Swiss-Prot record:
The lineage of its organism: Eukaryota, Fungi, Dikarya, Ascomycota, Saccharomycotina. This is Translation factor GUF1, mitochondrial. The keyword Hydrolase applies. This protein may be expected to contain an N-terminal transit peptide but none has been predicted. It catalyses: GTP + H2O = GDP + phosphate + H(+). Pfam families: EFG_C, GTP_EFTU, GTP_EFTU_D2, LepA_C.
Length: 645
C-alpha cells in the first residue's frame, strides 16, 4: 500500500509572502522615488546655473563640492572632476563637452526644497557654440576667479558672453584659504572690469568647501531666477549637446523650455525634420538615471535612437510630432562651421581601408568634426578633417596619435580662405593644394580674403614688450591695452590672422611670457589679404600634401627653411635630386642633393682608355634618362619627420 506525505500549508504562506515582497520591491524603484521627489518641487524652486571660469581656476573642484553637499556623490569618496567624463578633459584640466547634473537642496533658512541644475560648460572659444547653448539654458552663472591669479583672458571672454545673454552673475573668488593670495586686489579687478558690486562678491575655497554651503548655495537660491517656461504649452526642448554611446547611439543633453515629454512619445527635430520615438529619458545624477519623464525647466537627457551624432544639431528644437503646427521653433540656431583643417594619411597605404572604418568611428563621438576622403599624389589616399579651432584640432590630433602613433601622417593645420573671382562668385578653399596659383590669380581672381580673430591676452607687465613684439611679428594689429591693477597685470587686445594662431602662436606666447600669459579669442571675420600658395617641388614635381598658403611677406623665409629641412630627410639617389620652393610661379629657394655615383670602372684595366670613356658616357646618359622618366622614392618617414615641429 502506497503512503503519501503531505507538506504543511505554511510553505504556501511563505511563498505568498515572498511574492508580496517582490511586488513591493518593484513599486519602489530608485527612479520612481527620484521622480516623486521632483514632482513635489514647484517650477519657481528650480535653479539652472553654470560656472564661468578660466582654466585651472577651480571650476571642476567647485562642481565636486556642490555635488557632495547636495548628496549626489559620497563626500568620503575620492572625487575629482566628476563631471569631466572624457579622458582628455581630465588630462588637460579642460571641459570639452557640456555636462549637467541635477541636485536636490533643502534651504535651511526656509525649509523649502529646490531642484538645482548645474550645467558644466566648455570654457574655450573653440567650443563657444556649446557654451552659448548651455548659457541659454541657465538663469544665472557663478563667475569664478582664482584669488592667486586674478582675472584671466578666458574669464573676460566668457563674462561678456554670459552678460550679453542676460544671465544673473554671482562673482566668486576661489582659493581664499591660500596664504599668498591678495583677495582685496582681486575684488578691485572684478569691480573695475565687470562693474559688479563689491558686496555681491563671495569668497570660497572649493578644495576645502569653505563658504560653499554657508554663502554660495543660499546666493544661488536668492539671486538666480527660476526658469520662465510654461508647463501648459506644447512640449519643446533645446538641444544643448550630445555624445555617442556604442549601444544607445547619440545621447542628447536637452533643456525642457515648455511642456513635458515622456518615454515612448513621438517627437521631431525642427532642423532635420527627422522623426523619433523617445527610447529613454531621465536626469544626470551624476550619471544617466531614467525617470520616465522630463518637464518644464528641467535639464536632462533623451535617447531617440539616433545612429549618428551628426543627426543631433546643437541648438535644434525638439517637439511633439502631433503638435508641430502649434509649436514655435526656438530662435538662434546656427550651424557650426569648421575653421581649422588638417590632412591625415596612413603611413602604409595598404592600411587605408581598415583605418577608414576606425576614423569614421572616431568622429561619431564628435559631431563638429568634418571628415572627407582625399587623395594625394605623394601620400596616397587619406582624409581631410575639419575642426572648430586650434584647441579642438589639437585635442583630436592627440587622440589620433594615441590611437595610431607612427601609422598616421598628419599635415600642418590650415584655415579656410575665401577667394573672390572677377565674375563676382566666391569660393571657400580648405585645402591649400586647391588654392589658385599665380597664373590663375592674374586672370580670374579679384581678391583673396583671410580669416582674422580678436585676441585677448592677460599677462604681467614685465612681459608686455615681448608679447607686443610677438604679436607684431605675426601681422597683429593692436586694439587696446588695459592695466588691470596696480600689481602689474595687463590685458592686451590684438587683431591677428587665424593662420598664425593655429601655427603654435599659443606656444610662442607661453614661451615669451614664461608661461604667465593667458589667451582667448573670438572670430573677427575676413579681410582682404595678399596671400599666395607656397609649394615644395622635388625634381619639378609638386608635393601636394605639403602645400601651404602664406602671406607674401613670409613666403621667402619659409621657402628657404623648407628646402633646407626637407633636404635632411631625402636619401641620395643615382641621379641628382633638386628640391625647390615655388610661389607665384617663381622659384624662391633651391637645394640640390648630388647623385650617388656607381663605380662602373671597377673591373677595367687601367690602360683601357676607350672602354673607360664609353662606360662613363653610357652612365651619364642613363642618369639623364632616369631623371627624366623616373620617380624619386621618398620614404614616408621623411614626410613624418618634415611635418614634425
Amino acid at each position: 500500500m502506497l503512503k503519501f506525505r503531505i507538506r504543511p500549508v505554511r510553505h504556501i504562506r511563505c511563498y505568498k509572502r515572498h511574492a508580496y515582497f517582490l511586488r513591493y520591491n518593484h513599486t519602489t524603484t530608485p527612479a520612481q522615488k527620484l521622480q516623486a521627489q521632483i514632482e513635489q518641487i514647484p517650477l519657481e524652486n528650480y535653479r539652472n546655473f553654470s560656472i564661468v571660469a578660466h582654466v585651472d581656476h577651480g571650476k571642476s573642484t567647485l562642481s565636486d563640492r556642490l555635488l557632495e553637499i547636495t548628496h549626489v556623490i559620497d563626500p568620503n569618496a575620492r572625487n575629482k572632476q566628476v563631471l569631466d567624463k572624457l579622458e582628455v578633459e581630465r588630462e588637460r584640466g579642460i571641459t570639452i563637452k557640456a555636462q549637467t547634473c541635477s541636485m536636490f537642496y533643502k534651504d535651511k533658512r526656509t525649509g523649502k526644497n529646490y531642484l538645482l541644475h548645474l550645467i558644466d560648460t566648455p570654457g574655450h572659444v573653440d567650443f563657444r557654440g556649446e557654451v552659448s547653448r548651455s548659457y541659454a539654458s541657465c538663469g544665472g552663472a557663478i563667475l569664478l576667479v582664482d584669488a592667486s591669479q586674478g582675472i584671466q583672458a578666458q574669464t573676460v571672454a566668457n563674462f561678456y558672453l554670459a552678460f550679453s545673454l542676460g544671465l544673473k552673475l554671482i562673482p566668486v573668488i576661489n582659493k581664499i584659504d591660500l596664504n599668498f593670495t591678495d583677495v582685496k586686489q582681486v575684488k578691485d579687478q572684478i569691480v573695475n572690469n565687470f562693474e559688479l558690486p563689491e558686496e555681491d562678491i563671495i569668497g570660497v575655497s572649493a578644495k576645502t568647501g569653505l563658504n560653499v554651503e554657508e554663502l554660495l548655495l543660499p546666493a544661488i537660491i536668492d539671486r538666480i531666477p527660476p526658469p520662465t517656461g510654461r508647463p501648459d504649452k506644447p512640449f519643446r526642448a533645446l538641444l544643448v549637446d550630445s555624445w555617442y554611446d556604442a549601444y544607445l547611439g547619440a545621447v542628447l543633453l536637452v533643456n525642457i523650455v515648455d511642456g513635458f515629454v515622456r518615454k515612448n512619445d513621438k517627437v521631431i527635430c525642427a532642423q532635420t525634420k527627422e522623426k523619433y520615438e523617445v527610447k529613454d529619458i531621465g536626469i544626470m545624477y551624476p550619471d544617466r538615471t531614467s525617470t520616465g519623464t522630463l518637464k518644464t525647466g528641467q535639464v536632462g537627457y533623451l535617447v531617440l535612437g539616433m545612429k549618428d551624432s551628426k543627426e543631433a544639431k546643437i541648438g535644434d528644437t525638439i517637439m511633439h510630432l502631433s503638435k508641430v503646427n502649434e509649436t514655435e521653433v526656438l530662435p538662434g540656431f546656427e550651424e557650426q562651421k569648421p575653421m581649422v583643417f588638417v590632412g591625415a594619411f596612413p603611413a602604409d597605404g595598404i592600411e587605408f581601408k581598415a583605418m577608414d572604418d576606425d576614423m569614421s568611428r572616431l568622429v561619431l563621438n564628435d559631431r563638429s568634426v568634418t571628415l572627407e576622403r582625399e587623395t594625394s599624389n605623394a601620400l596616397g589616399q587619406g582624409w581631410r578633417l575639419g575642426f572648430l579651432g586650434s584647441l579642438h584640432a589639437s585635442v583630436f590630433r592627440e587622440r589620433l596619435e594615441k590611437e595610431y602613433g607612427s601609422k598616421l601622417i598628419i599635415t600642418q593645420p590650415t584655415v579656410p580662405y575665401l577667394v573672390e573671382f572677377t565674375d563676382g562668385k566666391k569660393k571657400l578653399i580648405t585645402n591649400p593644394d586647391e588654392f589658385p596659383d599665380g597664373a590663375t590669380k592674374r586672370v580670374n581672381v579679384a581678391a583673396f580674403h583671410e580669416p582674422f580673430i580678436e585676441a585677448v591676452m592677460t599677462l604681467p607687465q614685465e612681459y608686455l614688450g615681448s608679447v607686443i613684439r610677438l604679436c607684431d611679428s605675426n601681422r597683429g594689429e593692436q586694439i587696446d591695452i588695459t592695466y588691470l591693477n596696480t600689481n602689474g597685470q595687463v590685458m592686451l587686445k590684438y587683431y591677428l590672422p587665424l593662420s598664425h594662431l593655429v601655427d603654435d602662436f599659443f606656444g610662442k606666447l607661453k614661451s615669451v611670457s614664461r608661461g604667465f600669459a593667458s589667451l582667448d579669442y573670438e572670430d573677427a571675420g575676413y579681410r582682404i589679404s595678399d596671400v599666395v600658395k607656397l609649394q615644395l617641388l622635388v625634381n619639378g614635381n609638386a608635393i601636394d600634401a605639403l602645400s601651404r598658403v602664406l602671406h607674401k611677406s613670409e613666403v621667402e623665409r619659409v621657402g628657404r627653411e623648407w628646402v633646407k629641412k626637407f633636404k635632411e630627410y631625402v636619401k641620395s639617389q643615382l641621379y641628382e635630386v633638386v628640391i625647390q620652393a615655388r610661389a607665384n610661379n617663381k622659384i624662391i629657394a633651391r637645394e640640390t642633393i648630388k647623385a650617388r655615383r656607381k663605380d662602373v670602372l671597377q673591373k677595367l684595366h687601367a690602360s683601357d682608355v676607350s672602354r673607360r670613356k664609353k662606360l662613363l658616357a653610357k652612365q651619364k646618359e642613363g642618369k639623364k634618362h632616369m631623371k627624366t622618366v623616373g620617380n624619386i622614392q621618398i620614404n614616408q618617414e621623411a614626410y613624418q619627420a618634415f611635418l614634425r615641429r
